[in-house]
UniProtKB/Swiss-Prot annotation:
NCBIfam families linked to this entry: tigrfam_recA (TIGR02012)
Any one Gene Ontology BP term: DNA recombination
Name of this protein: Protein RecA
Record family assignment: Belongs to the RecA family.
Lineage per the UniProt record: Bacteria, Bacillati, Cyanobacteriota, Cyanophyceae, Synechococcales
UniProt GO molecular function: ATP binding; ATP hydrolysis activity; ATP-dependent DNA damage sensor activity; damaged DNA binding; single-stranded DNA binding
This protein's record includes keyword Zinc: no
TM region(s), chain numbering: none
CC terms in the record's Gene Ontology section: cytosol
Gene that this sequence comes from: recA
Length: 374
């Protein structure tokens, strides 16, 4: 490139004049559009993304701290996979810290007894059961703009039925009506969400695309707008049913972070959901204690500081319930190791490799135990 072109690429004005011009235009923009309409990224304390705990330590790790404040989150998965349970735990965490939460129950299926058993203060939880999708999203918009609500949950996108479809006859086609509704709503409320610091969680259902031969036929309802506007998308699946004998008492859930704009994506977290009790916090702690080496598992036995504390996972969790002081010490040690940079499956940058390593270790453990017995 010629030398004169290189020199022409830079501003010939002295740096003092450029700074003065920049300050003038910044002042003009703030006068026209309000304070905070433009800022230097390094000067903006609001640009630091704070988080809300999910209620599961493994999922908090996978998300980089929890659900981001002032962002849109989408949680999707098959039926009975734990979507609503996740949001109820988030509501409980917000209320514990003195925050205000709202639940927009478009499915008209909220169980207040179950919510209370998970720690939700149902007396102070704001609940709306809207008649139409437009009504639901308008309520969300007004709650967000009030800047007085910390968390809004919408259950679910699939149940946000457009007014035209409700007022029409059964069997009438309303092609793309829900997708247009969601697209308009996202354009309208996303800016307000960022300004207010309110987190909005949309639950979504899965559908199957017709005629897909190759690739994943699954898709979510409501069009593509939510996929783009969401800062975090979580794919939750039920991978195991927990049993005591023939009695089922819970499920093992796996969450994949399908999208994350505030932390590395594609991490995987697993945790237990107990029927009537929600996420097993002690189960999450035991998983992380084993992965960080605070608790050691040999065969079916778990040991802590050289002493056996339980045979089998369920007995070990029972021991942790009966010994809260030791459990608190274990949690402190686990958090210390995680702070120091210990890599576990939930915060691994190679989640698939970590999952394969864990699976291989699980398979080899019984073989080693049988060799030792022989």
């Amino acid at each position: 490139m010629p030398a004169d072109m290189k020199s022409g690429a830079s501003d010939p004005r002295p740096s003092g004049e450029r700074d003065k011009a920049l300050n003038l235009v910044l002042g003009q923009i703030e006068r026209n559009f309000g304070k905070g309409s433009i800022m230097r990224l390094g000067d903006a304390s609001r640009m630091r993304v704070e988080t809300i705990s999910t209620g599961a330590l493994t999922l908090d790790l996978a998300l980089g701290g929890g659900y981001p404040k002032g962002r849109v989150v989408e949680i999707y998965g098959p039926e009975s996979s734990g979507k609503t349970t996740l949001t109820l735990h988030a509501i409980a965490e917000v209320q514990k810290r003195g925050g205000v939460a709202a639940f927009v129950d478009a499915e008209h299926a909220l169980d207040p007894v179950y919510a209370a058993s998970l720690g939700v203060d149902v007396e102070n939880l704001l609940v709306s059961q809207p008649d139409t999708g437009e009504m639901a999203l308008e309520i969300v918009d007004q709650l967000v703009r009030s800047a007085a609500v910390d968390l809004v949950v919408v259950d679910s996108v699939a149940a946000l039925t457009p007014r035209a479809e409700i007022e029409g006859e059964m069997g009438d086609l309303a092609v793309g009506a829900q997708a247009r509704l969601m697209s308009q709503a996202m354009r309208k409320i996303t800016g307000n969400i960022g300004k207010s610091g309110c987190t909005v969680i949309f639950l979504n259902q899965l559908r199957l695309k017709i005629g897909v031969t190759y690739g994943n036929p699954e898709t979510t309802t409501g069009g593509n707008a939510l996929k783009f506007y969401a800062s975090v998308r979580l794919d939750i699946r039920r991978i195991q049913t927990l049993k005591k004998g023939t009695e089922e008492f819970g499920i093992r859930a796996k969450v994949k972070v399908a999208k994350n704009k505030v932390a590395p994506p594609f991490r995987i977290a697993e945790f237990d959901i107990l029927f009537g009790r929600g996420i097993s916090t002690l189960g999450c702690l035991l998983d992380l204690a084993e992965e960080t080496g605070v608790v050691v598992r040999k065969g079916a036995w778990y040991s802590y500081e050289g002493d056996n504390i339980g045979q089998g996972r369920d007995n070990t969790i029972s021991w942790m319930e009966e010994n809260p002081d030791a459990t608190a010490t274990i949690e402190t040690l686990v958090r210390q190791k995680l702070t120091e940079g210990s890599e576990v499956k939930a915060n691994s940058m190679r989640p698939l490799a970590a999952a394969a390593k864990t699976a291989a270790a699980d398979k080899s453990a019984p073989a080693k135990a049988s060799e030792a017995a022989a």
